[in-house]
UniProtKB/Swiss-Prot annotation:
The gene is pyrI. Disulfide bonds: none annotated. It comes from Buchnera aphidicola subsp. Acyrthosiphon pisum (strain APS). Keywords: Metal-binding, Pyrimidine biosynthesis, Zinc. Involved in allosteric regulation of aspartate carbamoyltransferase. This is Aspartate carbamoyltransferase regulatory chain. InterPro entries: Asp_carbamoyltransf_reg_N, Asp_carbamoylTrfase_reg, Asp_carbamoyltrfase_reg_C, Asp_carbatrfase_reg_C_sf, Asp_carbatrfase_reg_N_sf.
Length: 154
């Protein structure tokens, strides 16, 4: 008989971002500005996972992520799930899907891009090349980059 024990304390109401690849949890806290709130946030790092081997998890009390926020998670955590909790019960489970654009959370690798010199939020259009590689095109400088290059700038 397998005993399930919570590695991170349960929340009464709010959002749980589960199945985050290991070492990505802190990055998501920063990029999505989750720490700019008065709400209690609990994070678990390098937890055992059957799916991933190791995973991170973020629990945000009394906060429900928007569909836009959930889908933007997919660029970093494509297999994550977002669980909405109410009265300690799961009321909705959402699987992120890549949006057509990613706004505000990425930095353009082009040092000459206006977003790197002025208070302008970045915006990238997601594109796939003929080999199904994910590329991101900056809305402002119009340069296109491999996903790996953009994510390494963060």
């Amino acid at each position: 008989m397998e005993i399930n024990k919570l590695q991170v304390e349960a929340i009464k109401s709010g959002s749980v971002i589960d199945h985050i690849p290991e070492y990505i949890g802190f990055k998501l806290l920063s990029l999505f500005r989750f720490t700019e709130t008065e709400k209690r946030i609990t994070i678990g790092l390098n937890l055992p996972s059957k799916k991933l081997g190791r995973k991170d998890i973020i629990k945000i009390e009394n906060t429900f992520l928007s569909d836009e926020q959930i889908n933007q998670l997919a660029i970093y955590a494509p297999h994550a799930t977002v669980n909405y909790i109410n009265e300690y019960n799961l009321v909705r489970k959402v699987f992120p899907t890549l949006p057509e654009t990613i706004d505000r959370i990425l930095i353009c690798p082009n040092s000459n891009c206006v977003t790197n010199h002025h208070l302008i939020n970045s915006s990238f259009i997601l594109k796939e090349d003929q080999f199904f590689n994910m590329n991101l095109k900056c809305k402002y400088c119009e340069k296109e980059f491999y996903k790996k290059i953009v994510l390494s700038c963060q």
